[in-house]
Amino acid sequence: MYGRGKRKSKNQKYFELFRKFQERQVTYDWHTASFQGRNNYCKTDPDATFMHMKDDHMRNAQLKPGYNIQIGVDSEYIVATDVFSDRKDVWTLIPFLKTMDEKLGFRYPSVTADSGYESEEGYTYLRETRQTPYIKPQTYEKWKRRSFKQDISKRENMAYDAETDVYTCYAQKKLSPVFVKKQKSKSGYESEVTVYECEDCKDCPHKEKCTRAKGNKRLYVSKSFLEKRQESYENILTETGIQYRMNRSIQVEGAFGVLKNDYEFQKFLLRGKTKVKLEILLLCMGYNLNKLHAKIQNERIGFHLFKVKSA
């Protein structure tokens, strides 16, 4: 019932209110579907995610819509690339490797990646596929610092008895396992975390430097992750591991440097993940053609890895 001088009935009011709620719900459902597991998306390009860009030199925390581009490099050629909406590299490793296996038709015997790709799930996947990991631990650089080595709160600086499964802290107190809990990652991977608790932190003169907890000091340890991390850590310290890590830095970062700076490709011209992937594929093809031409000119055909210079 509409028009001047007419009062709407209660049913009419309820009906119109319900219709507004229904329209809002449809809009909210569409927005929720557009998130695709993210906490934000760009209205002009729903596949894009707001991220911190490296061009924010003043660190003003500027957020811009973008994509996480991953490339795989072999012998200085880009052999695989993919586009992700997730901002963290760690969640792109397994999907990227699966795409590589599918597209290339074979599997590389080893995988070299930066510390941003390290996770228990990634290590487990590489072990299942029988690929040797050369992944730098996330705490690799911290381990070298004097402040880390002198931090009594760190598990790495505590003595560990493998037979009794007990840690000993700086004050010579025992940290024993009290329970095991399950943790699920974003992708659904389930890991076991053993919780260790100190026998008594009361009146300990070092408590302020060791823990902020009101009660006893606790450690949360994934034994499976530590075992796999140690394996990868030992791999990167070998001669092969050192050479692979050096070449990852030269070839992968070098490829991104050429694409961004030499080609001056700072911004995608198209929108949507499918179109962006097509754009980066064409760009990588051009890069590979230029790389092939440069290798022919410099008589470097068959050259795969840069050698480590002896000190």
Name each model feature, range by range.
Residues 1-311:
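Anion-binding and metal-coordination hotspots
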